A protein has these predicted regions:
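Active-site neighborhoods and metal-handling regions in enzymes and metal-associated proteins
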Residues: 1-251
């Protein structure tokens, strides 16, 4: 069942999402050569807790970090640890915060120092594909209208969208209905209604869309070893234009 949030619930969600977005921004500022991914995770954890919230990911299904930090060919669910960032890496940071009963969820991929033109294009196309998708995140449209727009834009730029993992509803639970794929034909899936809150998150690979999960049962990498990027925001469906909730202004 798809949860429709009322205004009181949305007030809590907006705050959760502001905290989440600020934690993402903090992580992005830390991405530079010589920084350990565990350092970034600790900063994310400490910031979220300082705001009276809890890291949504910590302990979720046994996940050991407060954020997912995925470098280069790691698509999602990278476990923060001893890896020291190097010049030329691309670093995806996925963050969630739980505040007064509701979750925020967002992600972005950041360059570490100077990166290749191809890597920068991948980051840019991934981010823009999100904005292409939310043009269709409007009352009366269907979920797959978002999906189709993302896929069309990504593939027109020579990249592929991951199919094994998808976006999702978010609210009182970190993962709620409906699923929001980044691929598919338009005009399918549930109709969008005001009060729906969706984590729309293109995961885009430079090569094949296929992925594999490592022995730690979390780290998900591209099957061909090529780069991957990720961009995500929590989005509210309204009577008019969609509202991106994971923005940090005014915190």
């Amino acid at each position: 069942m798809i949860a429709i949030k009322n205004e009181k619930e949305l007030q809590c969600m907006r705050q959760a999402c502001k905290i989440t977005a600020a934690a993402r921004a903090l992580a992005g500022e830390m991405v530079r050569p010589g920084v350990c991914t565990k350092q970034i995770d600790k900063a994310v954890h400490d910031y979220i807790v300082s705001q009276g919230a809890k890291p949504s990911f910590l302990g979720y299904g046994g996940f050991p970090g407060s954020s997912c930090i995925s470098v280069n060919d790691t698509v999602i669910h990278g476990i923060p640890g001893g890896y020291v960032l190097q010049e030329g890496d691309i670093v995806s940071v996925d963050v969630g915060a739980y505040y007064k009963g509701f979750h925020g969820d967002c992600a972005a991929t950041y360059p570490c120092g100077s990166i290749s033109a191809d890597a920068q294009k991948l980051i840019d196309v991934t981010k823009q594909s999100f904005f292409e998708g939310i043009r269709f995140a409007k009352r009366g449209n269907r979920v797959s209208d978002i999906s189709h727009a993302i896929q069309t834009y990504v593939e027109s730029n020579g990249f592929s969208v991951v199919r094994s993992f998808v976006g999702h509803g978010v609210g009182a639970q970190l993962h709620e209905e409906p699923e929001v794929p980044n691929f598919g034909s338009p005009g399918r899936g549930p109709r969008l209604l005001p009060g729906m809150t969706l984590a729309i998150e293109p995961m885009v690979n430079a090569g094949t869309h296929e992925v594999r999960i490592l022995k730690d049962k979390w780290t998900t990498v591209t099957a061909d070893g090529k780069l991957s990027a990720h961009y995500e925001n929590t989005v509210l469906i309204t009577d008019g234009e969609p509202e991106i909730l994971t923005v940090a202004e005014g915190l």
